[in-house]
A protein has these predicted regions:
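N-terminal beta1-alpha1-beta2 module of alpha/beta enzyme domains
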Residues: 1-62, 163
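Hydrophobic faces of well-ordered beta-strands that scaffold small-molecule active sites
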Residues: 2-9, 38-40, 64-69, 94-98, ...
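Acidic (Asp/Glu)-rich catalytic clusters
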Residues: 31-32, 53-62, 83-94, 179-180, ...
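Short, acidic/polar
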Residues: 15-29, 169-177, 285-295
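An alpha-helical appendage that flanks or caps ligand/catalytic pockets
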Residues: 110, 116-157, 192-297
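Active-site mouth loops of central-metabolism enzymes
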Residues: 2-21, 68-72, 76, 159-169, ...
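Alpha-helix-loop-beta-strand connector modules within alpha/beta enzyme cores
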Residues: 49-70, 122, 126, 320-331
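Catalytic domains of carbohydrate-active enzymes, especially glycoside hydrolases
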Residues: 22-41, 177-187, 295-301
């Protein structure tokens, strides 16, 4: 069964007096569109994701905040306590998006010098400790990164509100971490013909992708290029970000931009290369985009986290493409 998530606006992209209302609006659009949840980012330059998650909860009926969790920011107990507190106060479910952290300078600023592979090992230990607490265990544990003694979680979490857990990462280490946790691995996808089947990975699989779909290819590309024009300043920022990132997905996507997009190749990295977003886009007619989505679904992708929507109509356009893709993909 496919699960769709949108993405919440970032505080650095809007004036402070407009940000809260914009979060509420995007969340409400996503809720009305029937999405499972909405991704809430975390990093050193934006507001706290748990406070944003509260705005999402208070602005919607069913939408689940998918909160990005970076181990360097808070103890595993604090994350478990936040999940159970939302359940206790609002009766609502939270999803967790575990991130290892791809921008090394952000980690160094916080005094964290953990290497790339070790950061995924830390994510595994962190997430398994969170899970044990949320399952109601009394936990005594001494690991490589964390140690607790007779720790329990109060208030306890109702079993039906146990969080969905994702691990963000396109590397083998990221997929292995998701498998160890029993989580969904979220990738930044290559074009479908370059992806391999995920059915044997032992972990659920999802992707971050943007979609611009319209009645025909030319109209979709007109919208896409107007929304994401070439930006020399953005290209320079992208190049600088590459130098301070040890993320495999960042390098992979940067190497994929040589083939020009077209009706035959709707996979587009223009927004990524101009530093407007971090995910690839699928651009074209509903049918063109649906064919690409169906190929991903056939490869085992079941969770799709779409980019920040500019308006409610964009979610409706994406829904048409997904509806067609679901009919094309084998049951």
């Amino acid at each position: 069964m496919l699960e769709l998530f949108s993405t919440c606006p970032q505080s650095r992209d809007l004036p402070a007096d407009q940000y809260r209302q914009r979060v509420a609006d995007v969340a409400a659009w996503s809720d009305r569109a029937g999405y499972r949840g909405i991704l809430v980012y975390t990093d050193n330059q934006i507001v706290d994701p748990w406070l944003v998650a509260q705005v999402v909860i208070e602005s919607t009926e069913q939408l689940c905040p998918l909160v990005a969790v970076q181990p360097v920011y808070m103890h595993p107990y604090t994350v478990a306590n936040m999940v159970s507190s939302f359940a206790h106060i609002y009766g609502r479910r939270i999803f967790l998006n575990m991130v290892a952290g791809g921008f090394r300078n952000d980690l160094l600023a916080l005094g964290d010098q953990t290497e790339h592979a070790e950061r995924y090992a830390r994510v595994v230990e962190y997430a398994l400790l969170v899970k044990r607490l949320l399952l109601g265990e009394r936990v005594s544990f001494t690991g490589r990164y964390y140690s607790v003694e007779n720790l329990t979680l109060t208030p306890p979490l109702p079993p039906d509100l146990f969080p969905g857990i994702f691990v963000s990462g396109s590397s083998d280490s990221g997929v292995a971490a998701a498998r160890a946790i029993g989580a969904t691995a979220v990738k930044y996808p290559k074009p479908p013909h370059e992806e391999i089947s995920t059915s044997a990975d032992g972990a659920g699989i999802g992707m971050r992708v943007g979609i611009i779909a319209r009645d025909d290819d030319s109209r979709a590309w007109k919208v896409a290029r107007a929304r994401f024009p070439e930006d020399r300043k953005g290209q320079i920022s992208h190049a600088l970000a590459m130098k301070v990132s040890d993320s495999q997905w960042h390098r992979q996507l940067s190497q994929l931009g040589a083939e020009p997009p077209s009706a035959e190749n709707p996979y587009w990295l223009g927004p990524f290369e101009n530093y407007k977003t971090f995910c690839p886009y699928l651009v074209g007619s509903y049918t063109t985009v649906a064919i690409e989505l169906a190929r991903y679904i056939e490869l085992g992708f079941e969770t799709f986290i779409l980019d920040i929507p500019p308006d409610e109509e964009e979610l409706q356009h994406a829904a048409v493409a997904f509806e067609q893709a679901s009919r094309r993909a084998p049951a």
